[in-house]
Amino acid sequence: MTKQYNIRELENNFERAVFLKGDSVHARETTRYLWARNNIFGKKVLEIGCSSGYGYQFLPKDIDYTGLDYDSKIIEVAKNQQWGDNAKFYHADINTFPLDQYDTIIAFEVIEHLDNGLEIVEKLKKHCKWLLITVPHNEPKGFWGVGSYNDQELLLDKGYLIALLNLEIFLCLNDAFAKCI
C-alpha cells in the first residue's frame, strides 16, 4: 500500500512545490525540468532543493542522480516514491554537505531562500562542470495562489541578479516561463 501524505503540509504553505509519483505536474515545473534535460552535461547530477524528487522523472534515465533537501520529511517522501534505481536522496544542509564532483548541478528556485546564496553558488561552481539555476523574477503577486510564499518577498532585486550573472553561471529568470541568459 502506498503511503499517504498531506501535500499542503509538505508544501509548507506554498514554500515549495511537491508532487508525488503519478501526480500531474504544473507546466511551469515541467518546463524547467525539460529545459534541464536538454542542458545536462555528463552523467553525474546533483539537485539542490529536490523536494519530493518529482523533477527526476523529466531528466534522462541514464544519469546518476543525487537529490538533496534540508527538509527530512520531504526526503522521506522522495525515498518512498521509488523514482528509479539511479536516484538517491539525502537530507542535508548545502552549507555543510560534503560535495563531490558532479557533471551538472541543478538548483531550481533555491538560491533566493538562502541567506548566503551567492556564496553557495561560488561553492557549487567548484564542484561541477555545468550549473543550472532558476530564480523567480517578475512574478505577479499571488501568482502561485493566495498566500504564496507566506507573503515573503522572494523576488530578486536587480543588484542580486547582476551579482549572480557576474559569477558567470547559466541562469534562468522565471518570467511566466523561463527566459535564459
Question: Whereabouts are the PLM-identified features?
Answer:
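Surface-exposed loop/turn segments and immediately adjacent short secondary-structure elements
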Residues: 140
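Conserved N-terminal segment of class I S-adenosyl-L-methionine
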Residues: 1-100, 104, 108, 118-121, ...
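Conserved helix-to-beta-strand junction in the class I
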Residues: 123-127
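Conserved beta-strand signature within the Rossmann-like core of class I S-adenosyl-L-methionine
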Residues: 128-136
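Helix-to-beta-strand junctions that scaffold the AdoMet/dcAdoMet cofactor pocket
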Residues: 114-115, 128
